[in-house]
């Protein structure tokens, strides 16, 4: 069986991907929550039996103001992982973000993801970056829209008119697996149908009682709509729309 390393294995997407890879790869998990550190990945790669690294470990969120942590975890750690993968000829699949698109880069988080794409292109050209768009699913990451809705009360800015390509976590995991066999340097992973935040909230409200406060105020660092670079190949999947994805997420 092939062997893969997943960094950020205890995170929202990492846990889902570990389960999905069961039977496909022998998975080595690395996560700071269990004492691991992606920066120290090279000795594992030097053993010569690793087929892939799925690098998901990162400081997340546009609204994250821990700039030193973002620099350390998203930039320096990525440089270490990418250069090690290149040195040992190991396929690198890494999580990028819709915020890496220049039109969407409003924060240090987005800047770090854009840096990763450029660094990989120059120093690990066989890597494939996966631009994830607003991923949601069971056990959502703290601070995301779905998490805030389920743990309300929750303030919805701009009257819920902001537009996103909400993408189900199962589709994101399939795209990461697709990227392992892909020779493209960058791919998009997004539900082709966009929805307003209000539409997403209304769909969640079919399953849970929500405590929402809609305001017309704009949230700093936020974008009305996440622009999609259509010049970047989109992974061909049967993407679930929010009705299907939230049913899988919230149905008991």
Spell out what each predicted region is.
Residues 52, 77-80, 91, 115-116, ...:
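Conserved cofactor-binding/catalytic machinery of classical short-chain dehydrogenase/reductase
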Residues 26-45:
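Adenosine-cofactor binding site in Rossmann-like domains, unifying the SAM/SAH pocket
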Residues 106-110, 114, 118-164, 169-171, ...:
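NAD(P)-dependent short-chain dehydrogenase/reductase
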Residues 76-110, 128:
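Conserved Rossmann-fold NAD(P)-dependent oxidoreductase catalytic core, especially the SDR/UDP-sugar
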Residues 41-73, 99-103:
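NAD(P)H-binding glycine-rich loop region in Rossmannoid oxidoreductase-like domains
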Residues 7, 30, 53-57, 92-98, ...:
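SDR active-site strand-loop-helix element
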Residues 157-252:
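C-terminal substrate-binding subdomain of Rossmann-fold SDR/epimerase-dehydratase oxidoreductases
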Residues 4-23:
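N-terminal Rossmann NAD(P)H-binding glycine-rich loop of SDR-like oxidoreductase domains
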């Amino acid at each position: 069986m092939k062997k893969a390393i997943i960094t950020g294995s205890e995170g929202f997407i990492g846990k889902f991907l570990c389960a999905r890879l069961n039977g496909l790869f022998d998975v080595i998990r690395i996560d700071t929550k269990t004492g691991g550190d992606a920066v120290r990945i090279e000795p594992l790669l030097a053993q010569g039996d690793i087929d892939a690294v799925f690098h998901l470990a990162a400081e997340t969120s546009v609204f994250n103001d821990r700039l030193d942590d973002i620099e350390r975890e998203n930039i320096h750690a990525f440089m270490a992982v990418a250069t090690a993968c290149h040195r040992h000829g190991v396929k690198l699949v890494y999580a990028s973000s819709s915020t890496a698109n220049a039109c969407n880069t409003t924060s240090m988080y987005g800047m770090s993801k854009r840096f990763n794409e450029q660094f990989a292109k120059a120093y690990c050209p066989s890597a494939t970056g996966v631009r994830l768009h607003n991923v949601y699913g069971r056990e959502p990451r703290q601070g995301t829209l779905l998490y805030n809705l389920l743990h309300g009360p929750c303030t919805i800015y701009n009257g819920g008119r902001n537009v996103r390509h909400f993408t189900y976590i199962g589709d994101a995991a399939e795209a990461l697996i697709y990227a392992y066999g892909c020779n493209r340097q960058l791919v998009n992973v997004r539900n082709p149908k966009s929805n307003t935040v209000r539409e997403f909230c209304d769909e969640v409200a079919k399953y849970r009682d929500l405590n929402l406060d809609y305001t017309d105020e704009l949230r700093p660092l936020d974008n009305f709509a996440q622009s999609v670079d259509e010049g970047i190949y989109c992974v061909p999947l049967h993407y679930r729309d929010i009705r299907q994805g939230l049913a899988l997420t919230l149905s008991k």
